[in-house]
């Protein structure tokens, strides 16, 4: 019987053909005790959740695992793991977790059931009691029921918090519980590695090093990359190096050697000041601008094009302006010397401030030629001639609207000496004495002459080429008495005005009484229009 069982085991269990069979001590037929045990386990499995059914299937596989020994190179069933010890530990842990879950659920159910019962009791009690007062025994019973419900609520809140904490711990995937999250300080950095494979080998060339550096080939120039190289400012020699700058550098070197203290360096001129200086300085030779910092293979061509643009359009206008200068200058050659002297002083004051050196503002010149750099000749205004003698003040009105004329003074009319000759027919409206503003005109006697002064309103036409009018106060008297009469006239006019204002009083006007118009007659008013527009006004 024992041999037959061995043959059956060997027939069912696969084994390697090149090794000896290892026979286990497992029995083929189950005993009565095992059958009874399985009967009870089936009843228990009906009570437990389907999660426990999976755990109960694993012990059945354990008997099958005992028949097969875990040997390397052996043929075994694909569904069964080779390590039985690992399977046993997994099964035991799963069963333990299932039992703990069942116990926790039962406790939770009991607590919730108690709280529900206590709440139901309280509801029934208060619905029956209504508004009646409670006795001491009833108060103690209500307090006990409230304590039970409060305890269950506190325990449920604590379990929820613990469950949340467990979920946080379980959320840490691929990470231990004590591990800290990666911070910025732990960020990865680049560390170059060297190939030392040929360090131990004896090479024929001793000059070649054993290390090979990892080289970044992206920095190498290529025909398909748009690379821009900058010239170094230290190695670059300025193009505007002249004899003046060399002399200045030699002098400064000598002063340093001799120990002479250097003067403070001159301040740089701003861009706007340099532009103004370049506009004022017309004779300054235009120098080539320094090469740009960016390497441009066509920079030489660009500079030539700019020179061509600067020179060609400005050549013609300067010649035209020079022709205008020749025409303008002869007009001002006949100006007297008194007008030239103040102009010379003004020009001297303009040129007197110390002009900056040429080297200080050449680099601030704008590259493009400005339209403001054209030569413009401004016509010099000659100073006006001032009258030699001042006239005495007089209150008489003396208006003169006249042009230049050459007429000799006559006995009947007195002409002003300063009036130039006019080329038009002139009318002289002469008045011997100014009339008062208010009141009737009165004839006054002057102190110098006892005869009354009569007004002479004479219109004297004169031959001239253009039209003009001269309003002069002409008197039939000598020139010596003219100034005395003017003074007397002012006094008499002021006295007469005061008398007239004192004699006449302001008349009161009555707005209720309509005023009869003296100028308009009955025939001049159109009655039809009055009726048509009567509705627009209030009477």
Swiss-Prot record:
<dbReference type="GO" id="GO:0051276">
    <property type="term" value="P:chromosome organization"/>
</dbReference>
<feature type="region of interest" description="Disordered">
    <location>
        <begin position="242"/>
        <end position="267"/>
    </location>
</feature>
<keyword id="KW-0509">mRNA transport</keyword>
<dbReference type="GO" id="GO:0000972">
    <property type="term" value="P:transcription-dependent tethering of RNA polymerase II gene DNA at nuclear periphery"/>
</dbReference>
<feature type="modified residue" description="Phosphoserine">
    <location>
        <position position="162"/>
    </location>
</feature>
<keyword id="KW-0813">Transport</keyword>
<feature type="modified residue" description="Phosphoserine">
    <location>
        <position position="214"/>
    </location>
</feature>
<feature type="modified residue" description="Phosphoserine">
    <location>
        <position position="49"/>
    </location>
</feature>
<feature type="compositionally biased region" description="Polar residues">
    <location>
        <begin position="448"/>
        <end position="485"/>
    </location>
</feature>
<feature type="region of interest" description="Disordered">
    <location>
        <begin position="44"/>
        <end position="80"/>
    </location>
</feature>
<dbReference type="GO" id="GO:0005634">
    <property type="term" value="C:nucleus"/>
</dbReference>
<keyword id="KW-0811">Translocation</keyword>
<dbReference type="GO" id="GO:0031965">
    <property type="term" value="C:nuclear membrane"/>
</dbReference>
<dbReference type="GO" id="GO:0005635">
    <property type="term" value="C:nuclear envelope"/>
</dbReference>
<feature type="region of interest" description="Disordered">
    <location>
        <begin position="347"/>
        <end position="493"/>
    </location>
</feature>
<keyword id="KW-0653">Protein transport</keyword>
<dbReference type="GO" id="GO:0006913">
    <property type="term" value="P:nucleocytoplasmic transport"/>
</dbReference>
<dbReference type="GO" id="GO:0005643">
    <property type="term" value="C:nuclear pore"/>
</dbReference>
<keyword id="KW-0539">Nucleus</keyword>
<comment type="subunit">
    <text>Component of the nuclear pore complex (NPC). NPC constitutes the exclusive means of nucleocytoplasmic transport. NPCs allow the passive diffusion of ions and small molecules and the active, nuclear transport receptor-mediated bidirectional transport of macromolecules such as proteins, RNAs, ribonucleoparticles (RNPs), and ribosomal subunits across the nuclear envelope. Due to its 8-fold rotational symmetry, all subunits are present with 8 copies or multiples thereof. Binds to NUP1 and NUP2 forming the nuclear basket and the distal ring. The interaction with NUP2 is GSP1-GTP-dependent.</text>
</comment>
<keyword id="KW-0597">Phosphoprotein</keyword>
<feature type="region of interest" description="Disordered">
    <location>
        <begin position="305"/>
        <end position="329"/>
    </location>
</feature>
<feature type="modified residue" description="Phosphoserine">
    <location>
        <position position="222"/>
    </location>
</feature>
<keyword id="KW-0677">Repeat</keyword>
<feature type="modified residue" description="Phosphoserine">
    <location>
        <position position="480"/>
    </location>
</feature>
<feature type="compositionally biased region" description="Polar residues">
    <location>
        <begin position="347"/>
        <end position="359"/>
    </location>
</feature>
<dbReference type="GO" id="GO:0006302">
    <property type="term" value="P:double-strand break repair"/>
</dbReference>
<feature type="modified residue" description="Phosphoserine">
    <location>
        <position position="10"/>
    </location>
</feature>
<keyword id="KW-0175">Coiled coil</keyword>
<dbReference type="GO" id="GO:0030466">
    <property type="term" value="P:silent mating-type cassette heterochromatin formation"/>
</dbReference>
<dbReference type="GO" id="GO:0005829">
    <property type="term" value="C:cytosol"/>
</dbReference>
<feature type="coiled-coil region">
    <location>
        <begin position="91"/>
        <end position="118"/>
    </location>
</feature>
<feature type="compositionally biased region" description="Polar residues">
    <location>
        <begin position="395"/>
        <end position="433"/>
    </location>
</feature>
<feature type="modified residue" description="Phosphoserine">
    <location>
        <position position="352"/>
    </location>
</feature>
<feature type="modified residue" description="Phosphoserine">
    <location>
        <position position="483"/>
    </location>
</feature>
<feature type="modified residue" description="Phosphoserine">
    <location>
        <position position="81"/>
    </location>
</feature>
<feature type="modified residue" description="Phosphoserine">
    <location>
        <position position="171"/>
    </location>
</feature>
<dbReference type="InterPro" id="IPR034432">
    <property type="entry name" value="Nup60"/>
</dbReference>
<keyword id="KW-0472">Membrane</keyword>
<dbReference type="GO" id="GO:0008298">
    <property type="term" value="P:intracellular mRNA localization"/>
</dbReference>
<dbReference type="GO" id="GO:0005543">
    <property type="term" value="F:phospholipid binding"/>
</dbReference>
<dbReference type="GO" id="GO:0060188">
    <property type="term" value="P:regulation of protein desumoylation"/>
</dbReference>
